[in-house]
């Protein structure tokens, strides 16, 4: 059992949380020890915090290529700026202030601690975090000047504390990677495309933005941006299995408790092998995901495994201390 620092009993050993720094007393007979503040597992292993992390050190090559293709579309920046100038961030802030629970140091403090861990590790100013009731296992980041992160309640209920940290870190990764302008536009376009907007003041702007080339390019980039932020999540959790298990739950839903994790990883490797070697598999994977905002969870796992197995992740984690705190 973990208690607040001021309640530490000298009769029991204490462990300082590697993630948030909270000092916890641990009863020898209490079973798995977790931090009383962030609820993450206690361990004496180190946790690296990056003082000067450059986004280019972890941005996925596919993200970089898709963003270049998006920016090359004539008029894209003008159209997006018009849309965001009209909607601004007020709509996002009003919606979630009115319909969701704002996370603070005293409201859902373990979630606040997880946000603080992710921001401290990546070197990002803390955005506002909200929890909204929703049966979908999902989260998203919106806004530009003052981004907000929203976690759906079902996600918190379904995932472990470490997996929730991974999701929070993924969303913070969007901020660190400077995705928020295009990401907010992509999500807004996706929403407007599903809504009766023809009679709204945004009609002319929406018509401009919903050209096939712009929509396709935005969705293509948004899918690949997720791969970069999965890497950011790994830089925070510092455990590839946490990322893998999170994706397994996104794939299997409530059935995930009956899924063998090792076989799921083997499935991810098999998918990557076929994608790399078989043109037809690659064609169908690209066609099926072309209308989606997120890549397949199995593909995301295979990409994280590849990043780890190529040694790129380890190289970043073992960089000289001059680049990390």
Where are these regions (language model features)?
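Hydrophobic or amphipathic, alpha-helical segments that drive membrane association/targeting
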Residues: 1-142, 215-218, 254-255, 274-286, ...
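Short helix/loop segments within enzyme catalytic domains
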Residues: 7, 99, 106-112, 118-124, ...
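Short pre-active-site segment immediately N-terminal to the catalytic Zn-binding motif
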Residues: 106, 151-166
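Residue-level signature of catalytic and energy-coupling elements of molecular machines
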Residues: 115, 151, 229, 296
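Active-site His/Glu-centered metal-binding helix of metallohydrolases
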Residues: 159, 168-177, 228, 232
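Catalytic Zn2+-binding segment of zinc metalloproteases
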Residues: 172-191, 200
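Short acidic/histidine-centered micro-motifs embedded in hydrophobic/aromatic stretches
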Residues: 188-192, 246-253, 304-307, 319
